[in-house]
């Protein structure tokens, strides 16, 4: 290798070619290699390797994206070039979406997503990590595709298959830390700093000496997925842990770089942040001084829905139950605020954090599609002690009610895999680390975390037990069972109705009104944008039938969980207990 200055070294590949005309053969273009740094053994893999066929501790293998075969030359982006905002997002994990847990197997299930009405597939992290199975958030080869899933070529085929079916692809990427096993990045330079700390240890170095190279490493990684693998959007994990005191935040630089690439490619590219800051600066354009994210996950929507449906009020759910010194009398009042304001914590006190939290959303001018709403996510299911889904906690009618609220809201909806049919399989935390000391530490950490919430640790599953991952694999045979099929039909109908009443343009929370009755356990939301069809989602969360007053008279019932028990009068809907209906005007 040749030093080219500033700590960089260069190698241009084989010095001789195998063909008589000087053209390298295929064997010349695929080479295994590793680095010996300052004489230290053993050699370590390339931090920018695209391919780790023998695992994250083994040599890297060269991979040329120009060798990929694509059939998506006519692809204009999700929703015929509209992008992710406002579309139906579907979060899935390659390793548990199917029993085989590969990209090839996932392709076989894509038609189900098309039939459901999905627009964008949100793929959980695929960066190379230690072991066969895992959630993916312990990635260490950030440029490499996890080989047990199929490797880089298989991922390209998956993206191509999605595009062939009209599905966009959003890839979950983790830039706020690296996993503990196979993390050799610090040997290559000052990629981490003790000037800041994170839950995983020293922070990624974004603002100390030599940070420009680290920032470039992250931005190049993002652009590579979008450019070389034709990905349409990136979900950025826990961006609040990107500790950056620079004059300009990394996310703003990343946003501008992605915008420039989108212009070059001629198709929309979106960045979706996972952020618990409740800070609208995250979704404010960089030209206005913001960080330029297209959208952000909105956990407040999840928390409000979950507490409303389940009655749980421990931990970070406490404030979402209302009462006890809050302005909101109960969980339904909290739900009303979140559905009309975007956040519960918009500068108000957070008892979980012990201080005021968040900023208000300008409901007149901020595009509501920039907030993602959901009833379940991998985190909100998998970080429960038994990984139990909402379908294991509440009856189908209540899940249907919650689904109607977020699927027909002006925010961007996201479904977690299997949610649409009320999957009976849990989603549990699983690992397959080869380092037994690390595995023991993970086990102890999970037990301590659940004990801190007051739960008995006797029921905590072993993340390293292969049965834990196997239990989390979707049981696709359930789709055709009557009870599951009913819920699936409901989700499909809500999505189809959304296309009629929400449309494809910008939306406003200011167009939403909500009326609740805490005692009667009823909710009515009215979305009435000027010049468009008005829609109301009407819920009876109580056990007994109830007459639920509407916020305007007339209309017609377009959808009901229990059609035979649902009747519309001039200004009310009579609903059976634990059910929902949608009224249009």
Residue map of PLM features:
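Core domains of carbohydrate- and sulfate-ester-processing enzymes
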Residues: 37-77, 165, 183-199, 316-319, ...
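Asparagine-centered strand-capping/turn motif at beta-strand->loop junctions
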Residues: 538-542
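Glycan-recognition and catalytic regions of carbohydrate-active enzymes
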Residues: 341-358, 415-430, 452, 456-535
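Substrate-binding/active-site clefts of carbohydrate-active enzymes
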Residues: 76-84, 93-264, 270, 282
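C-terminal beta-strand-rich structural cap/linker in extracellular carbohydrate-active enzymes
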Residues: 569-585
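The feature marks proteins involved in alpha-glucan
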Residues: 4-91, 98-101, 112, 437-438
